[in-house]
Structures are given as C-alpha cells and as structure tokens.
Design a protein with these regions (language model features):
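Structured soluble/peripheral alpha/beta segments that form catalytic or ligand/cofactor-binding pockets
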Residues: 1-174
Length: 174
C-alpha cells in the first residue's frame, strides 16, 4: 500500500456513511467507496459517487488536523462532511501491525507468552505517525447533521498533494 489510505465509518441519527479511499501519489485510486446506509430498513443504500478529500495536516507531521469529505454527486445534492478529530490512536504501535520488531501478528512467542507495554501518547507520536492512525471524530454535514465515528488514515511514501515529498517528510507550514 502506497500513497494515502483514508477510511471513515460515521453514524448519524437516521443513517451511516461508509467512506474509503486508497489514492496513490499520482492520483490513481485502486480503491474508493462512498455509500449511505439508512437506519430505515425499507430504504436502499445510496451510492454517493466519487468521494473527494481535503485534509489539513499538522505542520511538520503526517497527522490530520481536520478534514473535509465531499460527495459532489450525492443523490440529494452535494454532501459535505466536516471531520473534527477528537483523539488519535496510533494503532500500529503495540498492536502487531508492524512497528514492533519483537511482536507481530501470528509471530510465535512460545507457550502461554503474555507481554505488555505502556507508553505515554507523547512518547509514540513522533514515530506512530508513520503507521495507521485511527481518530475518534465528530462529523458535521452541510445539512446540519452531527454524528460520530472513526476517521482512519495513513500516508506511506510521498503524497505531494499534502506536502509529503518523500517517505519521511512532514507537511509544510501553511
């Protein structure tokens, strides 16, 4: 996986939206999805068309400060969702997702081995930003609806659209 990964299941009072994009540095999208699923079982899910993203990164990092997700071809007119992150979770640290050399998914450690690791958030931010990041987030639509859910992202390699010129650079100050 290279480029940007962005995934956001969001729950509102009468529907949920599932948004997902994998985009390469050159703008190619091997994967994209945007669908609204209604709470009312008599309503069919709605395809929202090609989703568009506008992320603002924290200068010097690969961390998303805020986002705007747009669905220009939504059935009822353009749908815009403002994403306000509430909490970062660096899921690639301490979970077996790949940043821990001594503990990976499926790695045999011996019979009945149990390990633990406790770190403060400020200790892992500097390297955790290079893995997968989940944010608890508030989502607000241009129709006034407020919901909550997950905003997940990762940037691997360059992603020049947001000022990431190589695999390790952070976003420039704006």
């Amino acid at each position: 996986l290279t480029g940007m990964w962005n995934y956001a299941p969001m729950q509102f009072s009468d529907h949920a939206i599932l948004y997902m994009v994998n985009e390469t540095d050159d703008g190619d999208r091997p994967l994209q999805e945007a669908v609204r699923i209604w709470v009312d079982p008599n309503r069919e899910p709605e395809a929202l068309g090609r989703p568009e993203h506008e992320h603002e990164l924290v200068p010097g990092t690969r961390l998303v400060r805020r986002s705007r997700l747009r669905f220009p071809r939504a059935p009822e007119g353009e749908l815009v969702v403002e994403v306000a992150p509430l909490l970062n979770a660096f899921v690639a640290v301490g979970t077996g997702y790949g940043m821990d050399p001594d503990w990976r998914h499926g790695m045999y450690q011996g019979p009945l081995v149990v390990q633990g690791l406790v770190r403060q958030l400020d200790e892992i931010t500097s390297f955790g930003q290079y893995g997968l990041i989940d944010q608890v987030a508030r989502f607000t639509t241009n129709f006034g609806q407020v919901g909550y859910g997950l905003h997940e992202f990762g940037f691997w390699g360059p992603f020049r659209r947001y000022g990431l010129v190589d695999a390790f650079s952070g976003a420039a100050a704006t």
